[in-house]
Each structure stands twice: as structure tokens, then as C-alpha cells.
């Protein structure tokens, strides 16, 4: 059912709890590489296969000296750097980061991530509200060029 502003008074007073069967994705970095998405992004991306309808979680790997494709999307992203150092280019602003830092990517901002190390892997967790935007029919992603 789709609601409009006229349906505001029809909000339920009770909630029906629905606990999904799948509540855990074990060994994410060993079981869930998203081959097509990784190829498009030009770096390894591991996607948590969980039933969230509003949030996604991925782990990204950037090899030494590697840079992702430049892209933008209609959903927000927060990245937490697990290990490594580098920078994220957000529009024309260079944001330097290292392990322990969190980086915010705003909606529809061109961005790309770079590992500045010549020897060490970079690993990061990305949390996005992409499933929410997909369910609302408002998710858009564009690669640069």
C-alpha cells in the first residue's frame, strides 16, 4: 500500500514484530565479494547479505596505490577506516584519513577514494542508506565520464 499526506491520521498504534530468519552474515570478507560491483568500482567490495530494508554495510579493500572510480549517488555514506591511510576526494575537497577515522560522503557529491600507501592494504567499512532509497524508488548512482 502507498500512503499520501492525507493518510497521516491512519498511522497504526501497534507494531507487528517480524524477526527475519537471517540475523548474521559470518566471515563477510571471506564469503561475499560482489564481483560485478567490485569490477565497476575498480576495487574489492564485500557486501553484507542481511535483510535490512534501510541500511547497507560493505567492506572495501584498496590495494597499495589503488584509487576507486569517481562516482556519485543519491544516498548518504559514512566510511570507517579499519586499516591503512589515504584520502577521499569529495567534489574538489581532499579529505585525508587513516585507520580510526570516519568520513562522510554527502548525497550526490562526486567522490573517489585513494590508498596512498605503496605497501599496505586499506580496509574500510561503508554504511549507506541505499536500501531505503531503493525502496523509495529514489536510488540513483552515476559513474564519472
Please place each PLM-identified region on the residue numbering.
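A short, N-terminal "cap"/entry segment at the start of jelly-roll beta-barrel domains
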Residues: 1-54, 140-145
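Conserved short histidine dyad/triad with adjacent acidic residue
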Residues: 40-43, 58-72
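Short, charged/polar surface micro-motifs in flexible loops or helix N-caps
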Residues: 52-54, 63-65, 85
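Short, conserved secondary-structure segments in the cores of folded domains
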Residues: 58, 74-77, 93, 101
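Short beta-strand His + acidic residue motifs that chelate non-heme Fe in jelly-roll/DSBH
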Residues: 68-70, 88-89, 105, 111-118
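Glycine- and acidic-residue-biased ligand/ion/polar-headgroup-sensing regions
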Residues: 75-86
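A short hydrophobic beta-strand segment most commonly corresponding to one strand
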Residues: 78-80, 104, 119-138
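Short acidic-glycine-tyrosine-enriched beta hairpin
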Residues: 92-108
Amino acid at each position: 500500500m502507498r500512503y499520501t499526506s492525507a493518510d497521516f491520521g491512519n498511522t497504526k498504534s501497534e507494531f507487528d514484530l517480524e524477526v527475519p530468519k537471517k540475523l548474521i552474515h559470518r566471515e563477510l570478507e571471506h564469503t561475499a565479494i560482489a564481483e560485478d560491483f567490485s569490477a565497476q568500482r575498480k576495487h574489492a567490495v564485500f557486501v553484507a547479505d542481511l535483510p535490512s530494508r534501510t541500511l547497507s554495510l560493505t567492506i572495501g579493500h584498496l590495494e597499495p596505490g589503488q584509487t576507486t572510480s569517481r562516482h556519485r549517488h543519491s544516498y548518504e555514506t559514512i566510511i570507517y577506516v579499519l586499516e591503512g591511510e589515504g584520502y577521499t576526494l569529495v567534489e574538489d575537497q581532499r579529505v585525508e584519513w587513516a585507520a580510526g577515522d570516519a568520513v562522510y560522503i554527502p548525497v550526490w557529491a562526486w567522490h573517489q577514494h585513494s590508498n596512498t600507501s605503496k605497501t599496505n592494504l586499506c580496509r574500510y567499512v561503508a554504511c549507506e542508506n541505499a536500501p531505503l532509497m531503493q525502496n523509495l524508488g529514489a536510488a540513483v548512482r552515476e559513474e564519472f565520464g
